[in-house]
Amino acid sequence: MTRNILALSAALLLTFSSLFSQKQTDPSANLNKLSGTPVPPQQWDEWFNTEVQKFKEKNQLGKTNMAQFTIPVIFHIIHNGVAIGTAPNISAARISAQLAELNKVFGGTGTNPSAISHYSQFVANPGISFCLALTDPTNLALGEPGINRIDAAVFGVNTSTINNDQALLSFIDYTVKPAIIWDPTRYLNIILSEKGPTANVLGSARFPANTSLMGLGAVGNATNDAVWCVTSTIGNTLTPGTLAGYANGKTLCREIGHYLGLRNIWGDVVCGSDYCSDTPPATGPNYGCPTLPHDINSCGPGLSPGGEMTMNIMDYTNDACRFMFTPEQVIRMHTAMSQCPNRNLLGTHGLCTVTLTTPPGPAI
């Protein structure tokens, strides 16, 4: 009996390993790990899951009408000295297109889920909107709302020349972010730059934390609590970026999901947990636009009868095939927005209104 159980366990392990290995290779491109967001340690999971439970109890298990949030955004566009509108110094129109995509996805008005009948009941409205900041940290009016353009020459290295993923992420975190970040308790800082041609990673973020956890590598602090995305992923279907499969703005949506406390749907290990009971387990990330239902019960009998939730924003599938968050994911995001430093003050400073300080004019 024991021998049979061991043999079965070994067979299941080999099966899951094979599935995960297959999913780690996108047949159309070398995009094995699209997100560079570090996996948070157990200490963070324990703390944040406790906060989620407190939030549920406070809001009657999330069944009352929850608050609406508006997050002011500043896009730091890193370029190589080219004219505005020439990549990577993308136009304000591309930024506006990306903002529209954020508001659609986080406003629960993404792609109509009727074609995915099994999961239509799990589509939730996060009730989160984004606006372009009108003023800088000194309260001066921005020439372009929500945009801060920066020549890469100030860093001595252009990120478009860095092909190693870890080197690229380290450069963003330890050189770029500390030099340009605006107060993360007031702004959602979004840094845009290009990557080296053979780098795989498309974005990264930091998880929310309380003051005692800000020393952990995976969570945000005053110098690194910003989201980074590859510029060619920025846009929407009407004004797209240029990266095939990932040109419609969903990369930034996913990274902001991490910024608001969401884990990947596969829990970052084979059949791991994202701590959301309404996202079925998955053996790993999915790519492309899988035929649905995809990988039914991949993690065990009866665990995902409708297949893996490949249309969830927190997967790696193509932008055209991702659109939804679930109620449990919304609760985690609202927990971050209401109870975490660097999140719970966002939107309280009037940064998207027109009360501002203008520079003094010439003497008359």
Describe each PLM feature range.
Residues 8-12, 142, 364:
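Intrinsic disorder/low-complexity segments
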Residues 139:
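Active-site pocket-lining segments that scaffold enzyme catalytic pockets across diverse folds
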Residues 7-8, 38-41, 243-245:
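Short hydrophobic "helix-edge" motifs at membrane interfaces and signal-peptide entry regions
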